[in-house]
Amino acid sequence: MSWKRNYFSGGRGSVQGMFAPRSSMSIAPSKGLSNEPGQNSCFLNSALQVLWHLDIFRRSFRQLTSHKCMGDSCIFCALKGIFKQFQCSSEKVLPSDTLRSALAKTFQDEQRFQLGIMDDAAECFENLLMRIHFHIADETKEDICTAPHCISHQKFAMTLFEQCVCTSCGATSDPLPFIQMVHYISTTSLCNQAICMLEKREKPSPGMFGELLQNASTMGDLRDCPSNCGERIRIRRVLMNAPQIITIGLVWDSDHSDLAEDVIHSLGTCLKLGDLFFRVTDDRAKQSELYLVGMICYYGKHYSTFFFQTKIRKWMYFDDAHVKEIGPKWKDVVTKCIKGHYQPLLLLYADPQGTPVSAQDLPPHAQLLSHTKTCYDSEDSGHLTDSECNQKHTTKKGPLVERRRGSGRIRRKADAPQASGYHSEGETLKEKQAPRNASKSSSTSRLKDFKETVSNMIHSRPSLASQTNAASPCVGRAGDQPDKIPARNLPLHSRGWETESTSSEARSSSSSKYRPTWRPKRESLNIDSIFSKDKRKHCGYTQLKTFPEDAAKEFAQDEVSNPVANDIKDGGPSSQHKLWGTARPGSHLLEQHPRLIQRMESGYESSERNSSSPVSLDAAPPECLNVYRDQSTKRAVGFVPSWRHIPKSHSSSILEVDSTAPVTGWTETQPFSDGEITSKSELDELQEEVARRAQEQELRKKREKELEAAKGFNPHPSRYMDLDELQNQGRSDGFERSLQEANSVFEESLHLEQEGDCAAALALCNEAISKLRLTLHDASSSTHSRALVDKKLQISIRKARSLQDRMQQQPPSQQPVQPSASLPSQGGGLPQPTSEQSVPLQVLLSQQTQLEPCKDSELGATSPFFHSPASCPEPHSSLVSPSPAQSVSQHSPPGTSALKLLKSFEVDIVNHSAFHRQDLPKATGRTEMNSQHECLPFDALEDRLQGHREDNSCCSKFPPQEGRDTTQDQLLEGRKTPVDISMGMPWSHSAGGATSERVMHSLNSPSSPSAQPAVPPYGACHPIMSAAASPVLHAADPMQKLNQHLQAQSLQTSLASKVVRGSEEPYRPEFPSTKGLVRSLAEQFQKIRNTSTRDVIGSQDRSLPNGLRKSSSPSDFMLPLSQGPEKEHCRWVNQPPSPDGRERQPCWEEPAGHPSVSIDSGLPNGEASRRRQPRLAEADIYQGKLPQVTDTRPTELGSSVSLGTSLPLDSWVNVTRLCDSQVKHRAPGLGVKSSSHDSRTCVTYPERNPILLHPHWNQDTEQETSELESLYQASLQASSHTGYSDWRSQDVAWQPLSLTGSADGMGRRLHSAPGLDLSKTPTAEMERILYEPSTVPVSQDSSNVRKKTLETGHHCSSSSSLPVIHDPPVFLLDPKLYPPQPQFLSPDVLMPSMAGEPYRSPGTSRSVQQFLAMCDRDETPQGVKYTGRTLNYRSLPHRSRTDASWGPGTETNQHIGARVLTAPACKPQLTYTATLPERHQGLQVPHAQSWGNLFHLPSHPSAVHPGSPPSSSLHVLHRSSWNSGSVLGSRTPGPRRIDVPPDDDGRQSQYPSQYRHRSAGEERVRFALSNTAGTEQSRVRLLQHSRW
């Protein structure tokens, strides 16, 4: 059917689709009623369509559940059934036979509405209303019915009284009360009055329409003066109630009247009750503005209906079974009527604010019907729809429409709500009479009232005002003659009403005399003659919008001001405008207050939704009304009826001729009544009132809209629209808020990008993308919103890609900085999904570069926090707490990078509850702040660590600035301190978060402050520090070395004293919880970045006395590895962190000389304190904990390894870069520290147990430390790219990276013989652990080293973990805690993906170790379960870098590796070996070369190594490789998926090549790793080369 197409063309969708949400209601608008040949039911079908689409009636009727049933003749039951079908039936054409039959039976005695006989639609409509009254309130007479639930009387009935007031003598006739359902007006009178009004007014106005109707209804109805003074008085009608639906019946003289076109053009879409009647007593009625929503037309003895569906805001044409969509504007209806020669017979004006009869007022039965009502489309004014929606569930789509309507209706609700009982006619009449008793005064006052109304309408609706002015002659007469003329007009009106109404006994009695004349005429109407002209259709339709169009654009503007009025005005004023000229539209608008118009249009043709209205009906009417009035007044002056310019029917031409007469304007009409001035004042008052009402209406509208939104009321299309609107509105707040949040996050990301923190920017960008995706889902109902969000989403995605590319393309140093930033967020986010983690990783890489020189200091305090999140979940708090101290001692330069790392890391940390993400979020958002704590003095750091330890959750709580200052100072003093810290921390890096944790423990403990600086490097911080300090270290290698050495000594002393004091232990417990997460991520990143550094540190740990190593690596490492400060430690050592700390303290004190030496030589004070903690750990090991550690290492070492692994995963990639930078930074001072520390780290970090299990490690460590230092120095000298003097010690420390190869093999041996398997010298063991994975063939390294790493708890190292490894940077030190995050990091940071995502066991820190192994892609230490080697690490070009950079260092590393491998006790450190080889890849090409597979495996072992030394090596290697390849992605095609196993074993082939590939500069770092000093320098140089 064409109407279907049209209807759906409106965008409503198919009829079924429309109805789908609310079956019948959605269907109703498009449903036709059958009219088979011979049935002649078109009149009934038209009446039914009107009733169904009248929202107010439908809703009210729906609520009626009980009635007086008449059986087969029960019209109520028949209506209910049809309405139900309208609502629920899927049929497009419904039968009306039941109702027709009931109607025929009901009126059988009267022989009306009989089957097969055509009858009058208006009368049918009226009689249906009366029958409804009878069924629901049959006891009450229709004339005095006050039943609150009587729809007919409460919503349709007009309670009127007629009175004649003599203007000369003042005599007043007795009021004649009566009730009418239909207000009949003669079309002839209407046209004549229109002509008169146009003659009197310069411009027609929308407000004139009501006046026109009033004048037409009373025209010729002149009565004799009650006192027989000889005056002829026009009768006056006073409206006593506030009907929400006004039905205007047009009585035609002929079936083929030539006035049809003029009448149509004269019709206004807005009707104000105050204008329609001489006076309105009900305040609601005074304010009420009704909008044309329905019209029954007649043509060729056939009735059809036009109705405005508020839901779709379009006029629909119902011709029995055919339903067509006419258009959104009244003009469209006018056009069709003119073309079809339709004669309007029944006009239905509804109050948009109308409400259904209240349920409480309804009889119990009445409520039954309510559901049917709900089904109605908001065809009627929408009053019912709103009310019904509010009372009941609004129709699915109804709510929105209802809201819209409601807002308009609300304004009218004051008017709309009929008095619960009509004002008693007697009282009203008396009240009215009193004024009218003085005929003149009464008429004057009435005229004033009328003027007020008209003027108000005029101001509100200029076109109507003009119309009113045009009709001013009549108005003037009306003013003075209301009493005289009313009699005739009234009879006509009554006549028409009675003619139609079969049951209008009272009415007929009052107006029966008029019935005969009009009824036959209507029946005989010749619509064809009427619709001969199309010209006026424009005006007629445009009352609301056409009027503005035709009458005046100003009026349109006014309409815009008064959306409601305007929309409705468009429909009505246009027609009026045409017939009336533009005046009618304006007058109509005036009649409708803008708010009313809005409501009407919403519910009707001109309802808010009416598309015809130029202005949104919802626009606030108050201002609009005043403006509109002013404009309308002005326009009225210059307004000429548009219909004049259009070919007109005969009557039209007459009107045009009359209109040619100068328009006097509204005031002209009023001169009769002394109301010109009064009317002006009244006008002002009216305007003010209108403005006030408009405001009130707006408020009501909003409230009602909300209610409607919640309920919905209109059927089919309307409800669809409403539903959509409701959806949008329902989610509008959430949607807007989400979009706003996404925008703010994206802006923050842009800001960070501008600052150079690409990693953090990427993390935020990814967050914005996720938010936008959610927002996009919320915006699904809005095309515009979806488009907007999609656009923003695409922009964000592009930005994220660009950031990734930028990070990958950045020099290793730069990328490490970004990874650092990413790592911090990643570290925080380790618990988060892998993808999230991978972002932080990238951030870390990018941060490292950015943070290399400056942010290290800033990040000094923050890096520990970052490390904590990066390293392990729980250690996070501890990590954070000691972080400041470590920052101070170790991460001065890395502070900046750590700062950024913390920024990104903090984001992740925020996501990690276990990691004290509370702190980390602070750090994440405030990476710089957090990183600042690194610089804190050891005492301050220790205090902070203690405080932080006290509140682990407040990782970021450490004065980042203070830490930053210290870090900055240290950076200023010498990046070597951060480097040394990184080197000293490499074990923390190597261990994933373990080393960091150890450092953090050291920080937590008295040595904690010194360890804390190293903590920043863990995961994110170290890489950052390396990145940041790398250049500086290069520049100030010797100086840094000295500074680091001095700092190491001072830190050693201070930390030793603090450890002795026992503060180490408290810090340690606190530290692990904080660093668990932060270090997990941070250290993983650092492991990647600081692979070299960590290897060096690992070597240093080995070179460090066993006590030192134990204290440093076991205590620091174990505690950091612990989920909590103590928990992590206990997991590692299977010992309370406190006992470990204490034991380590003694042990640390025992080898204090060595640690001090190593710290002095290679590590800053932070390194020294770390050493002390490792020594304490070693002491524990020596005391017999080493075997425990070996046993626990798979379990608890996993925790430590988890830190290491997590960091290697997260940090390794970053560590590769960070280590590169750290090697550079640390080269000066890390040598000694790193030697000793790395020895510790290698032993403790790869596998804490090996270190702890080696009771004789203190002595061996001292020896190995010396050897390793010499080896490292030789290596550093050999690979004097970096030219760091102190790299001799740092190289020794970094050799553990190369040493990782031997350390890997050694670690395996250690695993085999946990206690004594460790080499006598920690360096040997470290080398073994570090190199053994490297030494082991790739396969062996992959299987054994990773297995061991996995055993240690580092699944990420294993190939199986590779997918997890994808996001190694994200991995916490404890992968088990945050296994998914590495995956996240990989996506965010490509580099971390190379390192591989550590596969963390839920509760084992080995997972972290495994992660480390995967990160480094080196063979997993046999003792450690790093089976899941870094698939991504091989992606990371650690190998190439390692191979390239470790040429000179390889020999040293080989030597170290020989030692380590020689030392059977180092075998437990295979975890380190597994982990360190990854760093070795990045940093120890010589090791890999000398160790063969071990070195090739380094990248994998790095990923595999959970142990701190392997983790360190892994960190170095990963840092190098990631800096050059993974992180930078320059050599790597793209980010490696940690969660996906690499295509090939990168440890053997890919990673080495990648390393060679990636770092020319990273090779230096790897070289430095291979050669403790040379390797460190080499790695630093490599980092500088790759990054800078």
UniProtKB/Swiss-Prot annotation:
Zn(2+) 1 binds at residues 67, 69, 74, 77. Residues 380-391, 424-434, 1536-1547 have a biased composition (Basic and acidic residues). The active site is at 42 (nucleophile), 302 (proton acceptor). The modification Phosphoserine is found at residues 424, 574, 613, 616, 1138. It catalyses: Thiol-dependent hydrolysis of ester, thioester, amide, peptide and isopeptide bonds formed by the C-terminal Gly of ubiquitin (a 76-residue protein attached to proteins as an intracellular targeting signal). It comes from the Eukaryota. Residues 678-712 form a coiled coil. Residues 380-447, 459-519, 601-620, 801-839, 856-895, 950-969, 1093-1172, 1525-1562 are annotated as: Disordered. Keywords: Coiled coil, Hydrolase, Metal-binding, Methylation, Phosphoprotein, Protease, Thiol protease, Ubl conjugation pathway, Zinc. Zn(2+) 3 binds at residues 166, 169, 225, 229. The modification Omega-N-methylarginine is found at residue 12. Deubiquitinase that specifically mediates 'Lys-63'-linked deubiquitination of substrates with a polyubiquitin chain composed of at least 3 ubiquitins. Specifically recognizes ubiquitin chain in position S2 and catalyzes cleavage of polyubiquitin within 'Lys-63'-linked chains. Not able to deubiquitinate substrates with shorter ubiquitin chains. Mediates deubiquitination of PLK4, maintaining PLK4 stability by reducing its ubiquitination-mediated degradation. PANTHER family: INACTIVE UBIQUITIN CARBOXYL-TERMINAL HYDROLASE 54 (PTHR22975:SF5), UBIQUITIN SPECIFIC PROTEINASE (PTHR22975). This is Ubiquitin carboxyl-terminal hydrolase 54. It comes from Rattus norvegicus.
